[in-house]
Amino acid sequence: MIKIKNKELKKPIFQGGMGVGVSLSGLAGAVAKAGGAGTISAAQIGFLDPEFDKDPFEANLRAIKSEFDKARKISPDGIIGFNIMVAMQHYEEYVRAAVKAGTDFLVCGAGLPVDLPKIVAKAMEDMDQSLLAPALAPVVSTEKSARVIFRYWEKKHHCAPDFVIIEGPLAGGHLGFAKDQLSYYTFDVYEKEVRNIIEVCREYAARFNKEIPVVLAGGISTKEAADHAFSLGADAIQAATRFVTTYECDASDAFKKDYLDASKEDIILIDSPVGLPGRAVRNKFSDTIMSGGRIAPVRCRGCLKNCRPDKIPYCITDALITSVTGDAKNGLVFCGADAWRCDHLEYAEDVIESLLS
C-alpha cells in the first residue's frame, strides 16, 4: 500500500497535472474522493483571477491556496497535491505556497528539481512543527535523469524522493524527450528504460531504508495498458488524458469536445516555447504554427524562465488559456497519444474503475 504523508492511497492511481486550468480543484478533488491521488496544476493557476493580467504572480499565489482549499472541501481526507514545473518563473515561490497551503505531495518536472528538498524544508520552518512535510516526487523519463536526481539529492540533501513518476513518450503536453528520441523509443525499447529506472529506485530505496514507489505514466488509457504497467514493476499508474473527458474536469466543454471529436491522425507533435516537443490535438492554431506562422504575444505574464517574447512563435499562456476557456480551435489543446480513444463523457470515479477493475 502506497502512503503519502501518512495517508494510504486507496487506489494505485495518480491523476496527472494538466495546465493551464485543466486539472484544478474540481478534478483533483473528485479523483481524491474516489480513492486516487488528485493533482492540481500550478501552471498559471490564477488565470481566472480578475487581477491576473495586472499581477499574475500574486494571482497565482492566491489561487494555489484557494484551489487547494476547494479541492479539500470535495475530499476532506483524500490525497491532493500539486504539479509545479521547474521551468516556471517563481518556481520556488510557488512550491513554498503549495507547502503552506497544506499539499500532500509535490510533483515537479519540465526540468530537474534538484533543490526541491531544500525549498520545502525552508518553507516548513515557518509552519507548525507538528505538521508533516509533503511527499516529493521528481518526474523522470530516462535512467540517466533518474540517477542525476538520486545522486544529487543524496549528496546535497541527504535524502531520496518519496516516490518517482516515470513519464513515457506517449504522454501528453510537454514531453521529456527530443523529437528524435520519440522515434527511437519504440514500445520495446522504452520498456527496458522503465525497468532500468525502477532498478535505480529500488537501489536507493534499500540505501535509505524506505519505500520509493514508482508511478508509471504516459499512454495509460486502458485496463490493458494499466495491467502492463504493473507487470513491469510499477507500484501505481498515472493517467491524465482519460480524466479530461470527465464531468468534473475543470476545462471548458469545447476543450473536452476537441478530445471527443479527435481521430488518431489528429494527434500531433508541436514545438513549445519551453524548448520541448508537446503533444496536442491538431486544429487551426496548430496548423498556423506548424506551417511557420507566428502569433506574436500581446503581453508577457512571466510564465517561463527562459522565454524570449520577441522570439517565440506564440505565447503558451495565451494559447492554453484560449483553449481551456472555450475557444479550443484557436488555442493549444495538449493531449496524450490516446486522446482519440476518448468517445464519451464520464465521471472520474468511472475512469478509475475502468483502469483498475
What are these regions (language model features)?
Residues 1-207:
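Active-site entrance/lid segments in N-terminal catalytic domains of soluble metabolic enzymes
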Residues 3-7, 19, 164, 217, ...:
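Generic detector of short alpha-helix boundary/capping microenvironments
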Residues 14, 171-215, 221-357:
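Conserved active-site-proximal phosphate/metal-binding subdomains
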Residues 22, 220-221:
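Residue-level detector of alpha-helix initiation sites
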